[in-house]
Amino acid sequence: MLVLGDSESMTSISPMELWKSVGITRYICGQSGQRISESYYMLKHALDYQSPQVVLLETNMLFRYTNTPDSLRSSISDTAMYYFPVLQYHNLWKNIVNDQIPEGWQSYKGFAIRSGVAAYSKGSYMKKTKKEKEIPQINLWYLDKIRKLCEKNKIQLLLYTSASPVNHNYKRYNAVLKYAGKYGIPYIDFNQKLKELGIDWKNDTLDKGDHLNLSGAHKITDYMTMYLQEHYMLPDHRGDEKFTSWDTMASQ
C-alpha cells in the first residue's frame, strides 16, 4: 500500500503501527509541500517496481493554488524528473541542503514521528454548508490521471483527509465528496469523525491544528487499521522473511 500527499500524509497514519497490529505494509510517498503533479509521477515511478493493492491519497494538496505559468513550469519539471531520475535525486539533495527536513524529525517508512504539543483553541471549524471550495483545474487533471493510472493497474484508490482545523473546512469536504461520488471512490474525512476518534485538540496536534502529533496519529491509525481490514483483502506479512526489515524498524 502506498500513500500520496503533502505533509498531512506524513503525520496522520503510522505504517509501523499498521505493521505491528495487522502486518500490512504501507509506505508514505508524501513530502512537505508536495504538489499533486509530483504525486502522480511518484506513483508512476513506484509502479515500475511495486504492485500495491491500495493507494491512499491525502486531499490537502488538491487545494494548493498556483498561477498558470507556475503550474505549467511545475508540470514540466515533474515530467522531466520522471524521465530523467538524476534530476529527482538532485532535488532530494537540494531539500536536505536547504534544511527542508526539520531537525529532530524521525521518519519510519515515510511517517514523521513528532510528539510535541501546541494546542488548537479556536473552536468548531466544520460548519455545514452546501458551498464547495474550487479545486484548481490542473489539480483535477492530475487527480484524474492518478485515478486512471490506478484503474489501469487494478489498484484501489482511497481518498482521505487528515484531521486539521488549519487546512480543512466543509467547503473542501463537499468538493472532495462530489469528486469521490462521481467516480465511486471511497472517501474518509477524519474531520467528520472527531468525536468517534476521540481527537482532543489540546493534546493531539503538533502546531495549533495544522498537523497531528504522534498522539493524534495513533487515533487515526487505529481507525484506519479497522477500516482496511473490513474493506480490503490485504495480506499479513508478519513472519515473512522478505519483510524482516519491517520487524527491525518496528522494534526501534
Feature roles, as predicted:
Residues 48-51, 148-152, 225, 229, ...:
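Sec-exported extracytoplasmic/periplasmic mature domains
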Residues 69-156, 239-252:
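Secreted/periplasmic serine-hydrolase-like ester/acetyl group-modifying domain
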Residues 54-66, 113-197:
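Conserved, well-ordered alpha-helix/loop/beta-strand core segments that scaffold catalytic motifs
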Residues 13, 17, 38-42, 54, ...:
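Extracytoplasmic/secreted proteins, especially bacterial periplasmic and envelope-associated proteins
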Residues 33-37, 49, 133-141, 167-170, ...:
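Soluble non-cytosolic domains of exported or imported proteins
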Residues 3-4, 8-87:
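Membrane-embedded segments
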Residues 3, 28-32, 130-136, 160-166, ...:
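Second-shell loop/turn segments in exported
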Residues 205-246:
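Histidine-centered active-site loop/cap adjacent to the catalytic His
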